[in-house]
Amino acid sequence: EICACLVGSEMCIRDRQVEGAVSFNNQQGCSQVAPDQQFTMDVMAGYAANPNIYGTVVVSLGCENCQMDLVVKAIEERTNKPLKQVIIQEVGGTLKAVEIAVRYAKEMVAEASMLQKEEFPLSELIVGTECGGSDPTSGLAANPAIGAMSDLVVQAGGTSILSETSEFIGAEHILARRAINKEVHDRIYEITSRFEAHFHAVGEDVRQGNPSPGNKAGGITTLEEKSLGCIHKGGHSPINAVYDYAKQVESKQGLVIMDTPGNDPASVAAMVAGGAQVIVFSSGRGSPVGHPIAPVVKVTGNKITFANMEDNIDFCAAPLIYGEKTVEQLGTDLLNMVVETACGKQTKAEALGFVETAIARICNYV
């Protein structure tokens, strides 16, 4: 939890003590109600199990709600990868904990360096899709291009995750029509109505915070308008399943939905915890958000944003708006970039060191 974050960051960042190790700041883990604590443990266990990770050093203070034994049990239920534990209150304080954690991490990095790269079929790929800082070009170009890429992943036998439940509101009926069966159909309506209910319970309306000021400045006027653009990221494939926040997503599942908030770092965290190896993230206004574990490919449909934020954006879908390329061509180009990224090519967010992450709470935010 947050009291133990310094040890992880010291292990990874100060003087670059362990090349190849990453950490993340966990704001949760203590003083949480049971559902929130479950979210926290699901995210941490999912991170440890993600295919991009070789092994995990779990650091705790020792007195938090998310006790070490609970976290370790959650991780071991998902994976048998190397796992070490450090409890600050039991090893002699922060400096001693850093020393021990660094030693464990260096041992894991040495072991991981002995592994050989292997080829895997596209059917093993799990791609998470996200949008943030949207403007009208997101719904017109960037998200349709992501949707075309998503359809290609599904056609190859892989898995694509559509997220951000708050941005299904007003378009949930369109998604529900694509459900593979009644159970999935009903779950789509369930998660959207539950999301709105979280706000009604405290006397709020989800539309008071969504669209955001940036969305409105870009030209989006209503939540329904934003939702109609958001769901384009799911392409045209049937929807095969609806997963709860941060739960393990099986490979070769086709198009699935994960119940996440619209908050970008918290939504991306859930998909990575679910097993996504790569995130594809559209932003009409421009966003620097990355992730410590999974590379984030940034897409914009706005050529002005692409020029203004070239340091942050990997792929421009604006040619669709100007009739220079078809959505199918852009989908193929984007899939090629995703494959290159999965093979090790750095994204702009990785190169700049953006590693934002957050964990949702049971009373969801916009």
Question: Language-model features: where?
Answer:
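Anaerobic metallocofactor- and corrinoid-dependent redox/one-carbon enzyme cores
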Residues: 10, 15-16, 25-26, 51, ...
